[in-house]
């Protein structure tokens, strides 16, 4: 994961020396604490400034690849992404082993095929945002993958054009998923209300073996989901550099963690990770809970005004309760694994202190719900809590030492609800319009993910020097889901029929408790939402007052 900052300004402009740009650069550095690099070139009256920060996650663990990537001809690439595969038939020779840097390999491929930029970018499997300058045509390319899994914002003001992973003023807007190109001299004349070149939504996803896609949820169908999820996790986990020597006990050096509530999405992912992570490594389970004054008030005795003896504001959070339950289930199923339950407890005072920076990070998302979700991910990605390593620690949690995760990669279950009918709105659509209404609502959720979720979450969690990865948004897995009959994935006419195929997989993996948990949004499960008295009826869609 990296931070991208590009600026095009006239020669006489002092944009880069402005306090605003310096503040922006500081945020870019936070995204990539391992390295920060710059490159500058001129094109007529214009200065092109490329800046990148690097969180070292690809390539040899003892050799960081600097950015921006620059070659002897003057081509430049700022890359923030992960390439799992390039599908285009013209580039079938593109191979990437786990000791190679994907950005460097892509840069070489783009430079060696100057007429195939669109084809190459459109063939990438994996999350990405990028800025690429092609010196031969004086053309600037920029964009995000079709799902918008990495953030990229733009600002065009007073002939200054800025592309950045994060923003710090109301001038910034989100770059639409897809890729865009323009000759440098024409950039100040761009009308961004008109669409530039974009990745077509009809781009074929990877092929799927359709031989099993028949009938109801059969053993073969669940087994195939198992296979696809394992592959998605292998791509996202096994490429992470180890934090210790292979001949040492690595149980104290988790290189990966799961955003963990104890639900079926994260529960299945955690259980499958046990099958691919070496046995001598631990896995961190990140569980966040908030002190919520409004929720706490509901526990006070109406006559005395006192809280129950031994009341704990964090223990009553639903995600803490299901998280501990799911953690104990994992210990029972996989006793040889060291499962670190990282309990992150967030006092209300810390929430008040963090609100303004989180508002800035989530922008241009700007609703009450965005802030609640942003706060949950902000503190979760900081990874500072207490460490529970066995069931007996639950009784001793107030005596346990503090613990901060070392992992740079967070695994998220986002994408399961959107594709497998996990939201209440899916049930309502099914009740109103039947299967056609359900399928329409499912497609709307996929279409909205780039703007509603992914850019916002990337900006928040990357600010802590962390990268979030989404196995359920793996292109091959999404292709699998798109080929399956809706009734083979979910049965909303049945109680507990949402995400039915995933729940069945969870049961087979030995996690029946996690498999029966209902959907609960992180802002409600962690109690990050509606914290102050009188906000119980506040709509999550209400706009925030954001001053940036």
UniProtKB/Swiss-Prot annotation:
Signal peptide residues on this chain, from the entry's feature table: none
InterPro entries given in the database record: Asn_synthase (IPR001962), Asn_synthetase_domain (IPR051857), GATase_2_dom (IPR017932), Ntn_hydrolases_N (IPR029055), Rossmann-like_a/b/a_fold (IPR014729)
Domain called Glutamine amidotransferase type-2: residue spans: 2-193
Domain of life: Eukaryota
Cellular component per GO, a single term: nucleus
Localization: Cytoplasm; Nucleus
Keywords annotated in UniProt: Amino-acid biosynthesis, Asparagine biosynthesis, Cytoplasm, Glutamine amidotransferase, Nucleus
SUPFAM superfamilies: Adenine nucleotide alpha hydrolases-like, N-terminal nucleophile aminohydrolases (Ntn hydrolases)
MF (Gene Ontology): asparagine synthase (glutamine-hydrolyzing) activity
Domain Asparagine synthetase intervals: 239-519
Any one GO biological process: asparagine biosynthetic process
Active site: 2 (nucleophile)
Main location group: cytoplasm
UniProt xrefs under PANTHER family: ASPARAGINE SYNTHETASE DOMAIN-CONTAINING PROTEIN 1 (PTHR45937:SF1)
Protein name: Asparagine synthetase domain-containing protein C4F6.11c
């Amino acid at each position: 994961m990296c931070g991208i900052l590009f600026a095009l300004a006239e020669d006489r402009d002092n944009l880069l020396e402005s306090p605003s740009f310096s503040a922006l650069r500081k945020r870019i550095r936070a995204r990539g604490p391992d390295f920060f690099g710059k490159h500058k070139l001129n094109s007529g009256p214009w200065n092109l400034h490329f800046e990148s920060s690097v969180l070292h996650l690809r390539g040899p663990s003892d050799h960081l690849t600097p950015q921006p990537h620059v070659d002897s001809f003057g081509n430049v690439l700022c890359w923030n992404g992960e390439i799992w595969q390039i599908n285009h038939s013209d580039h079938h020779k593109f191979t990437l082993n786990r000791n190679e840097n994907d950005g460097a390999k892509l840069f070489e491929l783009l430079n060696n095929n100057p007429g195939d930029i669109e084809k190459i970018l459109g063939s990438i499997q994996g999350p990405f945002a990028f800025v690429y300058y092609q010196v031969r045509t004086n053309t600037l390319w920029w964009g995000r993958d079709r799902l918008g899994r990495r953030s990229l914002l733009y600002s065009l003001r007073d002939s200054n054009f800025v592309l950045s992973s994060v923003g710090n003023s109301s001038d910034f807007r989100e770059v639409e998923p897809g890729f865009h190109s323009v000759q440098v001299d024409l950039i100040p004349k761009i009308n961004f209300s008109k669409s530039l070149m974009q990745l077509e939504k009809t781009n074929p996803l990877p092929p799927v073996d359709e031989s099993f896609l028949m009938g109801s949820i059969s053993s073969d169908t669940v087994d195939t989901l198992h296979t696809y999820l394992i592959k998605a996790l292998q791509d996202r986990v096994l490429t992470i550099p180890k934090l210790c020597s292979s001949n040492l006990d690595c149980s104290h050096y988790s290189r990966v963690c799961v955003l963990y509530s104890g639900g079926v999405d994260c529960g299945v992912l955690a259980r499958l990770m046990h099958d691919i992570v070496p046995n001598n490594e631990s896995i961190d389970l990140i569980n966040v809970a908030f002190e919520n004054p409004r929720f706490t008030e509901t526990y006070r005795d109406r006559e005395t005004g006192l809280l129950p003896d031994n009341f704990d504001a964090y223990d009553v959070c639903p995600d803490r309760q299901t998280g501990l339950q799911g953690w104990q289930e994992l210990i029972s199923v996989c006793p040889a694994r060291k499962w670190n339950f990282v309990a992150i407890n967030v006092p209300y005072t810390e929430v008040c202190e963090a609100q303004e920076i989180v508002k800035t990070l989530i922008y241009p998302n700007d609703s009450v719900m965005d802030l609640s979700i942003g706060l949950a991910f902000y503190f979760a990605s900081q990874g500072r809590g207490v460490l529970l390593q066995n069931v007996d620690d639950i009784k001793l949690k107030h005596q346990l030492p503090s613990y901060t995760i070392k992992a740079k990669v967070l695994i998220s279950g986002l994408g399961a609800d959107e594709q497998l009918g996990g939201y209440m709105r899916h049930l309502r659509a099914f009740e109103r319009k039947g299967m056609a209404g359900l399928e329409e609502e499912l497609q709307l959720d996929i279409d909205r993910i780039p703007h509603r979720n992914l850019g916002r979450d990337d900006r928040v969690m990357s600010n802590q020097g962390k990268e979030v990865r989404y196995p359920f948004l793996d292109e091959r897995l999404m292709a699998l889901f798109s080929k399956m009959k809706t009734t083979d994935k979910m049965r909303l006419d049945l109680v507990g029929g949402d995400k039915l195929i995933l729940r069945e997989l969870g049961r087979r993996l030995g996690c029946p408790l996690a498999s029966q948990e209902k959907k609960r949004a992180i802002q409600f499960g962690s109690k990050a939402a509606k914290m102050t008295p009188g906000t119980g009826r506040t709509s999550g869609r209400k706009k925030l007052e954001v001053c940036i």
